[in-house]
Amino acid sequence: AAAITLPAPTGPYNTTLATFKLTDKNRFDPYAPTKTPRALMISVFNPIPASQCSALLTPYMDPITAEYEDAVYAPLGIPAGTFGSLDLQTCKPNPRKAQAYPIVIFSPGSGNSRLGYSAMAQQVSSAGYTVITIDHPYDADIVTFPDHSTIIGIDVEEDTDFAVNVRAQDVSFVLNQLSQPSISE
């Protein structure tokens, strides 16, 4: 599919986008087949004044996730290659100390990837908020890590209370990580 650049957000700010893998070494992943620490992927959208923006096109989602989502949405008539062809208009991260903005945490609906909500998160960020989107492994349909390993979702709806508790622990962990300069700036 031909490259499609999504419209720039309409708020008073432009945005940067960074992704991070966070590993909770104090908690095992309750869904993993082996005893491994819980690892999450997050996206962080930060507002940046237009005067400090060095334009950058950023893929809407990584190629592995895009290919997976293409297959998921093919029965709905979405052409192959659609998700991989989408780009966001972002800015290169600014090495100067970032201004602190109010934080919005976004946890996607069960079975969905955080990446499907990137345009929405970017739009909110352009209004002057740091927006952090979280993938919940085994709950999201797919989570792809920087080393290209993936976790395909399972049906976590059998025990909704348990799934909600795991998500709450994920969000608490992410909030605790905000003190790390690489995430909050």
Predicted regions and their residues:
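Short substrate-entry loop that stabilizes the transition state in hydrolases
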Residues: 84-144
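Aromatic-acidic/polar surface patches that form glycan- and anion
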Residues: 33, 113, 164-167
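Short, low-complexity, polar/charged sequence segments that are solvent-exposed and flexible
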Residues: 38-39, 62-65, 123-126, 151-153
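Domain-level recognition of soluble alpha/beta enzyme cores
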Residues: 2-104
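Alpha/beta-hydrolase active-site loop
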Residues: 138-185
